[in-house]
A protein has these predicted regions:
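Extracellular ligand-binding/catalytic regions of CAZymes and related secreted enzymes
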Residues: 21-23, 37, 95, 121, ...
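Catalytic beta-strand/loop cores that center a nucleophilic Ser/Cys/Thr
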Residues: 139-205, 238
Length: 238
């Protein structure tokens, strides 16, 4: 009996705890529940394993635990609230983890937060701070925007109060006014992809707007961004 228990113990020790999922999706304060759900749907449809973390969990995570993941995704929402719900220690931990090799995908609010936001941002951009896309100045808060991608031509993608990403990284896609809509680059040893638009947007978000690009093509584009960030694969750029 003792020998049997020892064998079980040794077997469990050899197996160890399960490896973490490769992707950590932030679901905490300030994130849009609808955007979290849209990203979860794409991850699950494409069999990409992921874990989630809310603000409390991210505030308590250690750098060694965070660096066990390959990619951190911060979705859309309110970048002011995202920063406010995290401690300065937490954002410093995330920054160190990215610069140690964790990759980062920031979508809309997540892109603002990835820059040098004054609201406890991550500053993965060496001090570059992003402003809103110019449509905001015309009183427009959501729109179907034709985005010129360097590799795949023009796609109509959903935009809602998102940033233009001028001043950092290689430009993957542009807004109609020529400002960057998607950028990529290194932050230390981490690969960073920032998007001012929402290619993951479901059909329900399109009501009242006119798109030339079908939802399926938009969601495929979202998957492409996720895989590029996860696998550190540079996208075609200008």
């Amino acid at each position: 009996m003792f020998r049997y228990l020892c064998l079980i113990s040794l077997g469990l020790a050899a197996c160890g705890p399960p490896a973490p999922a490769p992707i950590l999706l932030f679901t905490g304060g300030g994130t849009s529940p609808g955007d979290v759900a849209a990203l979860q749907a794409i991850l699950e449809e494409n069999h990409l394993a992921y874990a989630t973390a809310n603000s409390w969990q991210l505030n308590g995570i250690t750098e060694s635990r965070l660096t066990a993941y390959r990619l951190l995704i911060v979705p859309g929402g309110n970048f002011v609230k995202i920063g406010d719900r995290l401690t300065a220690d937490a954002t410093a931990t995330i920054r160190r983890a990215v610069q140690s090799g964790v990759n980062y995908l920031g979508i809309c609010a997540g892109a603002f937060f990835g820059g040098d936001s004054p609201y406890n941002g991550l500053n993965l951009t060496g001090g570059v701070r992003f402003g809103f896309y110019s449509a905001e100045n015309r009183g427009i808060h959501k729109a179907a925007v034709p985005i010129a991608d360097a590799g795949s031509g023009t796609l109509d993608l959903y935009w809602e109060d998102g940033p233009q990403l001028d001043g950092w990284g290689a430009v993957v896609a542009k807004y109609p006014d020529g400002s960057p809509a998607i950028v990529e680059g290194m932050s230390g040893n981490g690969w960073v992809v920032l998007a001012g638009i929402h290619p993951e947007a479901p059909a329900s978000w399109r009501r009242g707007l006119i798109f030339q690009t079908p939802v399926s093509a938009s969601r495929d584009y979202s998957l492409r961004l996720i895989q590029a960030a996860l696998n550190r694969s540079p996208l075609p750029h200008y």
